[in-house]
Amino acid sequence: MDKIIKSIAQSGAFRAYVLDSTETVALAQEKHNTLSSSTVALGRTLIANQILAANQKGDSKITVKVIGDSSFGHIISVADTKGHVKGYIQNTGVDIKKTATGEVLVGPFMGNGHFVTIIDYGTGNPYTSTTPLITGEIGEDFAYYLTESEQTPSAIGLNVLLDENDKVKVAGGFMVQVLPGASEEEIARYEKRLQEMPAISHLLASKNHVDALLEAICGDEPYKRLSEEPLSFQCDCSRERFEAALMTLPKADLQAMIDEDKGAEIVCQFCGTKYQFNESDLEAIINDKA
């Protein structure tokens, strides 16, 4: 089961979140049939949103949009504060690797664009923030958002490793934030440790990668685990929701679906689930509108 572990240094100088998101990203790949680069880009976005949602309280919903002008198109993710996330990428078929190393490429195919977050607190006044894409690698773009928009300097690591068949092998990430009151000496020590950390791809390849991430972040500094919470890919779409959407269409459009297509098929963008509405279903919707 995927999980996020929240911890804090006993000195109170920093906090760290580490995530295992392997099942989340694997299910997203399965549902959207993404190729290598698209899988990694979508996976990193989902992990970023899991971190962002874990930082919220109440029943907030958080939308992350990575909007580029190159091959990927838009990547959209929605998460809640209960550990659920869903998402999709416009172009599922990007599959580019470095010839020499086999490294999956992401940044060069994101292009210029923006990292957009929308936090809906359920009050009818969602908070929206937009920052430019810095590298297109998503982790750096997320860190820039946290620094610029939330005024919280953060170290971020996100990645998805694929097996020889380009299926998700492991996915996860971390966030480290210095807390108010940390001394200059403590800040310098944590910065040095982060700079000397192995690459996240190396840490994720470890047998117990969540523990490996925590150990690399904290080193010999004593820390306390605050919580361990489950994470999952879960879509909240339903037949009833799409039926309500059909109810908003003009009768003429619904009748055209009956006459020309003998029904309608609606596919959820977030999870790929298909909902069929036959002629009788559409006629009932038309009658309900009368």
Swiss-Prot record:
Gene Ontology biological process: protein refolding
Subcellular localization, as worded in the UniProt entry: Cytoplasm
Alphabetical keyword list: Chaperone, Cytoplasm, Disulfide bond, Redox-active center, Zinc
GO cellular component, one term: cytoplasm
GO molecular function, one term: unfolded protein binding
Posttranslational mods: Under oxidizing conditions two disulfide bonds are formed involving the reactive cysteines. Under reducing conditions zinc is bound to the reactive cysteines and the protein is inactive.
Cysteines engaged in disulfide bonds, as pairs: 235-237, 268-271
Domain of life: Bacteria
Family per record: Belongs to the HSP33 family.
Function according to Swiss-Prot or TrEMBL: Redox regulated molecular chaperone. Protects both thermally unfolding and oxidatively damaged proteins from irreversible aggregation. Plays an important role in the bacterial defense system toward oxidative stress.
Family matches, as HAMAP family: HslO
PANTHER family attached to this UniProt entry: 33 KDA CHAPERONIN (PTHR30111:SF1)
UniProt name for this protein: 33 kDa chaperonin
Organism this protein belongs to: Streptococcus pyogenes serotype M6 (strain ATCC BAA-946 / MGAS10394)
Lineage of producing organism: Bacteria, Bacillati, Bacillota, Bacilli, Lactobacillales
